Amino acid sequence: MRVFKTGLLAFALLAISSFGLHAAQPSVQKMAEKHTGSLLELYKHFHANPELSYFEQNTSARLADELSKAGYEVTYPVGKYPAHIDYKCWGVVAVLKNGDGPTVLVRGDMDALPMTEKTGLPYASSARMADISGETVDVMHACGHDMHTTVLLGAARMLADLKNQWSGTVVIIGQTAEERGGGATALLADGLYERWPVPDYAVAEHTDPSLEAGQIGYCPGWAMANVDMIDITIRGVGSHGARPHQGIDPVVLSAQVINALQTVVSRNINPIEPGVVTVGSIHGGTKHNIIPDEVKLQLTVRSYKETVRKKLIDSIERITINTARAAGVPQDRLPVINGGVEYTPALYNNPELVANTVEVLKSELGEQNVIEIMPSTGGEDFSEYGRTTHKVPIFMMRLGTAPAGSDPETRPGLHSTLFYPVPEATIKTGVTAMTATVLNLLRK
């Protein structure tokens, strides 16, 4: 009798699936279209009113208010920066409980960049604000965090509307200071996994101009790199520019160090292991005819594996110190190397979570619009949510932003003064993908 009933149930389910389930219940994508108009206006507001890392109070206040209106239990502000960062953290945590089941954390970041927008959009940013040095700078959303915040809210609204389709808990995170690598750790330091439910999964999206609007990219395993910011002070002995023999020139020494650093990856790292060392800034001297006492270098170092990361940093220190010694720099004037400026750990997308999610996304968006992509040497502190003792599986998908048919070689990239997403298509796809992902993880 049990076999018979099971057979009937299976037949009934097959019949429903074959003859009208989707007709009775609109797809997530169709439902997302209904929210796109209101979300578009919100996106334009966020884009036109960007705020730098540590100063996201207006963005987070708006997000908190909108999440509260959607029925979430909102706590704001949340976050605790380290003692040396003397700023209030404006993080947002919003919870929607809907019976028994898993907990899914959905994160979006909110901060912008100190850049002058040149897109010419009618809603382009003309914002200016003081940065952490006190200097007033132009501010722009050049990394898509305005889109991340908009999509986060759209998915939150959708999940509230679709409570009859899922069971469990949704934790929405509005995160600060991603561009400085400290926002995720600030939330965790303030008890994110103690004061609120520990997630069984954590998911996020990041805009990607290498993909067209309407497309989603995914990368199982290592997806984004360790990011180390290193400051080096090359110290010499200052003198008159007409009498260089009376000093030790830190400008020439810096040039030698920079050239030598080009061998760190090519001669110290296994060729099949990714690694990047870039000198992004060099500053020294005040006048044509003065050999300065010191020159300052700023480096960024990228890797995936911890063993490679350590070898890169050790090689930088060895080359820098010994190049100075070879130039006759005395022991008390050897270079000062600060490797703890900023660090963001590599992001590892849980392969099982990725595989599970990708099938759902292909069903919702079409197989041709869900594309496996290569790992990136960019960095993202979303990785921090999976690095605690709870070992939460995480997945950050990539959200296409480029106009259909545009040339990938000439599209403005992230952190470009010309970058902007195609708004409607990006919003709809982002909300669809995130909502479908969470529904799949919490499906009744």
Label each region the model flagged.
Residues 7-18:
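Bacterial N-terminal signal peptides
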Residues 91-92, 128-140, 146-147, 158-281, ...:
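Histidine/acidic-residue-rich, glycine-tolerant segments that coordinate divalent metal ions
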